[in-house]
């Protein structure tokens, strides 16, 4: 096992140079360096994720508003909502976050591009949290799932004009007039497709279309689409 001194300061610099040049590097040292490097990167990602999370809980209007709305719904509950319900961790899948009604919110520290990506992701998952408290969502019910995904993508800010344009641009079918709705629908279909009760992407699209009008129009707890 490595001492902490091996992974810091001059000794880490020496090991890095040795790894890059290969001079005097044994196979065991190479493997150990790669393992230590990965551990250092995971720790760095985790600390940055929690730093961004705490900043958003303090300063983001959307996040603060959603936390207040959740706290109001949660009055009288034995399970108080606080920052312990929002954790950062490594995710093997290509997703930026997740929500579980019993465990809370997961932020995928290795998938978040920057502070603002975390804000969109956290806002998205907080809307799921709100929906679950307000309507006791059955997450295996495809219509329930689709409705919350539509609301989360629409209200979180992840489908605002500039974010969607950065992802797609004009050459990938982006349309200014309906860009927001197209983005919401696309992302909802992707999420519902991952539900174990969903048969196919076409099945997910059908479910999303069935609940679209009422769910897209429902902006609670906001008065309108804020971001």
Swiss-Prot record:
E.C. no: 3.4.24.-
Residues annotated as the enzyme's active site: 125
Q: Per the UniProt entry, what are the Gene Ontology biological process annotations, in alphabetical order?
A: mitochondrial protein processing; mitochondrial proton-transporting ATP synthase complex assembly
**Localisation:** Mitochondrion inner membrane
Specify the protein's topology with respect to the membrane: Peripheral membrane protein
One of the entry's Gene Ontology molecular-function terms is: metal ion binding
Record key words, sorted: Hydrolase, Membrane, Metal-binding, Metalloprotease, Mitochondrion, Mitochondrion inner membrane, Protease
Q: Which GO terms describe its cellular component?
A: mitochondrial inner membrane
Q: What is its main location?
A: mitochondrion
Please tell me where a divalent metal cation binds in this chain: 124, 128
Q: Which domain of life is it from?
A: Eukaryota
Looking at its record, which EC class is this enzyme? Answer: hydrolase
Q: Does the keyword Glycoprotein apply?
A: no
Q: Can you tell me which family this protein belongs to? A: Belongs to the peptidase M76 family.
Purpose of the protein: Has a dual role in the assembly of mitochondrial ATPase. Acts as a protease that removes the N-terminal 10 residues of mitochondrial ATPase CF(0) subunit 6 (ATP6) at the intermembrane space side. Also involved in the correct assembly of the membrane-embedded ATPase CF(0) particle, probably mediating association of ATP6 with the subunit 9 ring.
Oligomer and partners: Interacts with ATP6.
Record's protein name: Mitochondrial inner membrane protease ATP23
Organism the protein comes from: Saccharomyces cerevisiae (strain Lalvin EC1118 / Prise de mousse)
Gene designation:
ATP23
């Amino acid at each position: 096992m490595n001492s902490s001194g091996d992974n810091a300061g001059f000794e880490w610099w020496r090991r890095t140079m040795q790894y890059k040049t290969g001079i005097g590097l044994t196979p065991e040292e190479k493997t150990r360096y790669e393992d230590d490097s990965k551990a250092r990167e995971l720790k760095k990602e985790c600390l940055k994720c929690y730093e961004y999370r705490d900043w958003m809980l303090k300063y983001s209007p959307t996040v603060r508003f959603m936390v207040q709305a959740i706290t109001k719904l949660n009055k009288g509950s034995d399970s108080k909502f606080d920052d312990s319900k929002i954790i950062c961790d490594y995710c093997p899948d290509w997703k930026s976050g997740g929500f579980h009604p019993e465990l809370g919110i997961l932020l995928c520290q290795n998938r978040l591009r920057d502070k603002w990506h975390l804000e969109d992701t956290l806002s998205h998952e907080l809307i799921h949290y709100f929906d679950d408290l307000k309507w006791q969502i059955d997450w295996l019910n495809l219509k329930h799932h689709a409705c919350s995904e539509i609301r989360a993508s629409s209200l979180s800010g992840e489908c605002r004009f500039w974010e969607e344009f950065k992802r797609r641009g004009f050459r990938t079918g982006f349309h200014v007039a309906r860009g927001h709705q197209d983005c919401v629908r696309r992302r909802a279909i992707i999420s519902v497709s991952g539900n174990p009760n969903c048969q196919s992407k076409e099945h997910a699209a059908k479910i999303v279309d069935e609940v679209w009008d009422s769910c897209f129009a429902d902006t609670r707890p906001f008065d309108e689409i804020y971001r």
